[in-house]
């Protein structure tokens, strides 16, 4: 697996859009915030164009995080498949923190070969006024992010939405290690 670390939103967005525009089979996009600004529209248009080329497109976005975004922005044409993660979850009423959480992940997987993960939401603000360290994975490590998306999609899809095939877990040998901001433990 080839790993690329980004430090600027403009750079990672350019690469993400390039991957979407080069997709041949399937795109899996999961995001927390997706602004209806020029950059958000560029992502939306790239997904629509991919779908028109015959690429399967699956999108998950968080309903609560996008309350200020006009819902018409998320009216993506069929056959794009969309899950709007619910604004209110059952755990809120029962004061169960584990069942009231948000979908805060930001994942893009293209053709099961290229994956991006990090903290950037989709929006022009994040391109120039935000700092994060997203990563692009090209190769077998992208499968882990694909599997994470597939599991989430299948657990949250409506009955009229397609069930994504679960390819099963694969052996993954991590080359990067994430650790808390404290002494690492082995």
Show the residue positions of the predicted features.
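Charged, low-complexity intrinsically disordered terminal segments
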Residues: 1-186
């Amino acid at each position: 697996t080839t790993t690329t670390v980004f430090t600027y939103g403009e750079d990672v967005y350019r690469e993400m859009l390039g991957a979407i525009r080069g997709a041949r089979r399937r795109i899996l996009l999961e995001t927390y915030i997706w602004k209806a600004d020029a950059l958000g529209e560029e992502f939306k248009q790239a997904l629509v164009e991919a779908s028109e080329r015959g690429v399967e497109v699956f999108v998950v976005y968080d309903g609560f995080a996008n309350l200020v975004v006009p819902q018409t922005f998320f009216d993506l044409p069929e056959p794009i498949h969309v899950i709007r993660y619910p604004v209110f979850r059952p755990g809120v009423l029962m004061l169960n923190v584990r069942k009231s959480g948000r979908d805060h992940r930001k994942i893009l997987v293209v053709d099961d070969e290229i994956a991006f993960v990090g903290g950037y939401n989709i929006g022009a603000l994040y391109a120039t006024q935000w700092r994060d360290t997203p990563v692009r994975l090209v190769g077998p490590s992208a499968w882990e992010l694909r599997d994470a998306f597939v599991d989430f999609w299948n657990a949250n899809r409506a009955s009229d939405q397609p069930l994504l095939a679960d390819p099963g877990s694969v052996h993954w040998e991590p080359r990067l290690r994430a650790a808390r901001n404290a002494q690492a433990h082995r």
